[in-house]
Amino acid sequence: MSKLIEYDETARRAMEVGMDKLADTVRVTLGPRGRHVVLAKAFGGPTVTNDGVTVAREIELEDPFEDLGAQLVKSVATKTNDVAGDGTTTATILAQALIKGGLRLVAAGVNPIALGVGIGKAADAVSEALLASATPVSGKTGIAQVATVSSRDEQIGDLVGEAMSKVGHDGVVSVEESSTLGTELEFTEGIGFDKGFLSAYFVTDFDNQQAVLEDALILLHQDKISSLPDLLPLLEKVAGTGKPLLIVAEDVEGEALATLVVNAIRKTLKAVAVKGPYFGDRRKAFLEDLAVVTGGQVVNPDAGMVLREVGLEVLGSARRVVVSKDDTVIVDGGGTAEAVANRAKHLRAEIDKSDSDWDREKLGERLAKLAGGVAVIKVGAATETALKERKESVEDAVAAAKAAVEEGIVPGGGASLIHQARKALTELRASLTGDEVLGVDVFSEALAAPLFWIAANAGLDGSVVVNKVSELPAGHGLNVNTLSYGDLAADGVIDPVKVTRSAVLNASSVARMVLTTETVVVDKPAKAEDHDHHHGHAH
């Protein structure tokens, strides 16, 4: 296929146009008074959302050079979402501000490499300053505050706070759609672990990139599964039940994995394969935990069990299994509450007996997963469109709450980027020379962008608000809900540090990439045929 090539300033400017189109669409969603974006769908009704990454994912531009710029900035939103689960709009706005400020300087003859180095050092300094100023979060109230800020809804905040405080730091909070109008919280037997599907072809929910299995059977296997003749007899028995299958093994590879993928594509058997977490004896022990929760048996060749000879009786079950690319959640496993309680008792006894701190910590993790169960937030709404929007809000709130528990919180509303972050940059600037200093200056200017748009979306003059907040003491800023200035943490306006740090680091990464781009190569678009001259002037 023939290519189009652009160089230097022309290439960077074309990418900037695309980047602006994406960022200008996403930025209207920022803040408690952020606006909605309506997304038309090829099938079904439109989606109404104020979730930045959902908007970003929908955007594809006609001009290939512009689209390249849009896709680069989109990667900032998706990466921030993957790491922190929230903060996608902040990341997009920061990236736009950094790139625009940087491109102005590059056009004026500043060395883009030195500029990029300065931006990188600034991002690291801001990240460290935010971590250093973080306040730890614990307890139902603290978690609920974070979730309320993320979802803009106190009821959602309270539900997430209750869920997280019940299942604990390592526990699992799952979000499901409900057929009722209200949103409610349930606690069930279940377990989660940090391993995802082995092939993207297993995905059933394309919006969330998840494989969702309802009323599933579960095969737990201690070793690798690669031979199709070994797996096929059991697959045929499972197909006869009409139920989906989750396979957890040391690995699933070769023709066994290929067959599962082909079945998934043809929709003949819904099955998902994941690797078991951990290694060696720890993996074996965790598979036994899974067996207790799901009511199944671990197929163990060492104990004389042969995969091709086992029947449905060794399979566990669950009401629902949700698998993403990074983790697996089993909800309402088929094991009895008594068996789970006995297993937890056994783990507690092992913890008491162990002399090793490391062993105790790892056993404690397993106990938390086993005993914590799964909190299920069932989201309901009056219409399909409202349901999707509310479910997105709850998912963001859960992600923000987990991030806050992990690394703590800082004052929200864009204020921590003005106060703590800019203070760190003033100290850094004094230690740099040459064009690297300009990189720090660009970064310092860009840090005001999130606050500017939070204020602008609330109908205020962004520049006036930025100047006012800059003069206030650290931790003070604009509470957009009340349109008043004050102590943000006391007002419950807070952000998880992990979310803000991820936004800063990902924005700086893509900005350095764009600023040092000298040539852009894209596929030449296929020309649409011009039909006009075929149709007559005979009327």
Swiss-Prot record:
InterPro entries documented for this protein: Chaperonin_Cpn60_CS, Cpn60/GroEL, Cpn60/GroEL/TCP-1, GroEL-like_apical_dom_sf, GROEL-like_equatorial_sf, TCP-1-like_intermed_sf
Modified residue annotations for Phosphothreonine: 25, 54
Keyword Phosphoprotein: yes
E.C. number(s) listed in UniProt: 5.6.1.7
Cytoplasm is among the record's keywords: yes
Effect of deleting the gene: Not essential. Increased heat sensitivity (at 55 degrees Celsius). Inactivation of the gene does not affect cell wall lipids, or growth and survival in macrophages, but mutant shows slower growth in the mouse lung and spleen in early infection and fails to produce granulomatous inflammation in either mice or guinea pigs. This is associated with reduced cytokine expression in infected animals and macrophages.
Quaternary structure and partners: Forms a cylinder of 14 subunits composed of two heptameric rings stacked back-to-back. Also exists as lower oligomers, including monomeric, dimeric and heptameric forms. The switch between the single-ring (heptameric) and double-ring (tetradecameric) forms is mediated by phosphorylation on Ser-393. Interacts with the co-chaperonin GroES.
Additional notes on this entry: M.tuberculosis contains two copies of the groEL gene, groEL1 and groEL2. GroEL2 is probably the housekeeping chaperonin, with the GroEL1 proteins having evolved, following an ancestral gene duplication event, to take on a more specialized role or roles. Recombinant GroEL of M.tuberculosis is unable to act as effective molecular chaperone when expressed in Escherichia coli. Although M.tuberculosis GroEL1 is capable of oligomerization in its native environment, it cannot do the same in E.coli, which probably explains its lack of chaperone activity in E.coli. Can complement M.smegmatis mutants.
Protein name: Chaperonin GroEL 1
Gene expressing this chain: groEL1
